Amino acid sequence: MLLKDYLPNINKKFKNLNFSGLAFNSKEVKKNYIFIAIKGDRFDGNNYINDAIKNGAKIIISSKFKDQIKNNIIYLKQKNPRQILSNLSSQIFKKKPQNLIAVTGTNGKTSIANFYYQILKKNKKKVASFGTLGISGKKKIENTSNTTFDPIKIGKNLNYLEKKKINNVILEASSHGLKQHRLDGLKFDIGIFTNLSRDHLDYHKTLKDYLNAKLILFKKLMKKGSVAIFDEDTKYAEILKNICKKNKIKKFTIGELNGDLLIEKYSIIDNKQELTFSFNKKKYNLKTQLIGKIQIKNLLMSILAAHKSNIKLDNILKS
């Protein structure tokens, strides 16, 4: 692979360099790899550059060094190595499933990803989910310690799923993952916002920073003409509506007071929740053993996402 095909804005004298792979973990570096030195919360990749070189790295990308050649190793300065990692990963692993869905919010990401996965499976659609529970698809591919995977793992696994003709993939998008550019380079067909509460403020420091991290999904990572799904009852609905309007994203909302999918009746009978909702001027009834109104809303957002993935609403409710 030629560097100029992946980093067109780099110093001209380095454009014709070849590389064979990419890593940000020095232990995973092989011959002629690019090593991207990333400063994390616990480890600084710049401290492992020598290890990466011993393992075969020929190109080092870091925010700490100027462009130079030293001992036959190319050093390239980039302001945001995390962003470079995501963009390179996305370009190297070009093939991706057709329908990419991301779900973000403080609570409910895992539930929605699981509901969506189950709905599509029951409707005989090929589907996979990435998130807290690992990767689920045709089979369990691998587990992970992060809700949102690193960009190389995302790229490799999306490429794998596309080859297996799995066309629908839902990813949990954490605020950490969004702020750290792990999903940069991807464009989503459907984005889901669950809710926001005071969490992870050890990392984000302020609620505003936490919200802005979540909103990266809708501001920067959605396709034109894509679909945003969120709760009309949340106090952040107006912010999301404005973002959708500005970025030409179609919005579909759920809610008890307002919403495209409107909850009209809700009751608990014999430890089951029963509700009536309307959508597209038609009423539907739903019974579920899920507990709590929050889970009902998570389920309804999953139903909307499945419907926008070309499954008829009647078929979804039968499943």
Identify what each model region corresponds to:
Residues 1-87, 91, 235, 262-265, ...:
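N-terminal leader/targeting and accessory segments in enzymes
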Residues 3, 62, 66-72, 162-167, ...:
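Acidic, Mg2+-coordinating active-site environments of NTP-dependent enzymes
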Residues 13-22, 83-86, 149-152, 156, ...:
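Short gly/ser/thr-rich secondary-structure transition/capping motifs
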Residues 75-77, 100, 127-129, 191, ...:
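Conserved beta-strand scaffold positions in the cores of enzyme catalytic domains, especially
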Residues 89-135, 140:
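Walker A (P-loop) phosphate-binding motif
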Residues 131-153, 157:
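P-loop NTPase switch/communication element
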